[in-house]
């Protein structure tokens, strides 16, 4: 990793696919585009995402996860033991290809290494983050038709994820984020769910981040310091930063990835709004322990709005950096 400024800015992972990529995917599904041309479209989309992140001034970018349709489906298609029966309605007219576990979970082959290798080759910085869905979330968002209990399923998934993470490190990954938005879904699972995350990152030599978002953090908060990652990033903006009191109560001692952009609201935050929110966060945590990010992935927004939100996030962060510099902090 290269040196980062104080209050590094990053993204959670996903970013809107360009319209032309969505059209390319449609044509490919209709048999009107070759596999080779589709891969070229994916590669071009990754370059476009990096261009947006670079222009916005993001310190730690991702490739936007543009090759992945969904965060669970992608991995279920590549890990042995899953089967898809058909789409399941989530709400209204929205459907999700929910996977079913029908046999023992086994790691097959690298799932993200090619994706990461290409991203690394076109990234504007070596401070590149790669994301992977965590074992608990994959299990919680799947049907279990094989394992006697969910815990056994989750720990087998943790072993598979661990192997993938180690392959990413071998390929040169320096910052790896485990996405666990479902970890705080069921209070009775949290203690061993945390153990499963630790199993997934066991023996990994990289900067490790965990992402958690939306829901009640209260019954997972006592376990945050037990999770063997360097940083946990949270959705905070949508909750008006109320979880900061909870984190303070339990002596949160890791780097805080602070969500300052609402990804479910098309209204673009102003840079001053972001700066004010960061000042609020710094009342609870020292700037050396804080990273700045959106609440969650940006894929559900239009590309224009997602980009504008990142610009405001970065500009607001710069305002606070300058204030800290005047107070004697080293910000570069």
Curated annotation (Swiss-Prot):
EC number: 2.1.1.-
PANTHER family: 5-METHYLTETRAHYDROPTEROYLTRIGLUTAMATE--HOMOCYSTEINE METHYLTRANSFERASE
Positions annotated to bind Zn(2+): 211, 213, 296
CDD domains, sorted: CIMS_C_terminal_like
Cofactor note: Binds 1 zinc ion per subunit.
Entry cofactors: Zn(2+)
Organism: Saccharolobus solfataricus (strain ATCC 35092 / DSM 1617 / JCM 11322 / P2) (Sulfolobus solfataricus)
Keyword Zinc: yes
InterPro entries documented for this protein: Met_Synth_C/arc, MetE_arc, UROD/MetE-like_sf
Protein family according to the UniProt entry: Belongs to the archaeal MetE family.
One GO MF term attached to the UniProt entry: 5-methyltetrahydropteroyltriglutamate-homocysteine S-methyltransferase activity
Alphabetic keyword roster: Amino-acid biosynthesis, Metal-binding, Methionine biosynthesis, Methyltransferase, Transferase, Zinc
Protein name as annotated: Methionine synthase
NCBIfam families: PRK04326.1 (NF003317)
GO annotation (BP), single: methionine biosynthetic process
Pathway membership, UniProt: Amino-acid biosynthesis; L-methionine biosynthesis via de novo pathway
Record function comment: Catalyzes the transfer of a methyl group to L-homocysteine resulting in methionine formation. The physiological methyl donor is unknown.
């Amino acid at each position: 990793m290269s040196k980062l400024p104080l209050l590094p800015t990053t993204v959670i992972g996903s970013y809107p696919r360009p319209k032309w990529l969505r059209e390319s995917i449609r044509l490919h599904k209709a048999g009107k585009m070759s596999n080779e041309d589709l891969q070229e479209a994916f590669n071009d989309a990754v370059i476009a995402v990096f261009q947006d992140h670079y222009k916005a001034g993001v310190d730690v970018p991702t490739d936007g996860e543009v090759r992945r349709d969904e965060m669970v489906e992608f991995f279920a298609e590549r890990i042995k033991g899953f089967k898809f029966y058909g789409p399941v309605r989530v709400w209204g007219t929205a459907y999700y290809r929910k996977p079913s576990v029908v046999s023992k979970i086994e790691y097959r082959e690298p799932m993200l290494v090619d994706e990461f290798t290409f991203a690394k080759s076109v990234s504007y910085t070596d401070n590149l983050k790669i994301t992977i869905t965590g074992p608990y979330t994959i299990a919680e968002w799947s049907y279990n038709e094989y394992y006697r209990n969910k815990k056994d399923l989750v720990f087998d998934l943790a072993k598979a994820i661990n192997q993938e993470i180690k392959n990413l490190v071998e390929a040169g990954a320096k910052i790896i984020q485990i996405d666990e938005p479902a970890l705080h879904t069921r209070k009775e699972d949290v203690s061993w769910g945390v153990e499963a995350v630790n199993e997934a990152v066991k023996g990994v030599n990289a900067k490790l981040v965990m992402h958690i978002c939306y829901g009640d953090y209260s019954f997972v908060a006592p376990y945050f310091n037990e999770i063997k990652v360097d940083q946990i990033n949270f959705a905070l903006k949508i909750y008006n930063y109320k979880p900061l009191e909870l984190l303070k109560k339990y002596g949160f001692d890791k780097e805080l990835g602070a969500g300052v952009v609402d990804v479910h609201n098309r209204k673009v935050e102003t840079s001053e709004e972001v700066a004010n929110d960061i000042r609020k966060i710094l009342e609870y945590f020292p700037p050396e322990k804080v990273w700045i990010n959106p609440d969650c992935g940006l894929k559900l927004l239009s590309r224009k709005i997602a980009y504008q939100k990142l610009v405001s996030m970065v500009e607001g962060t710069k305002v606070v950096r300058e204030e800290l510099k005047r107070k004697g902090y080293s910000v570069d």
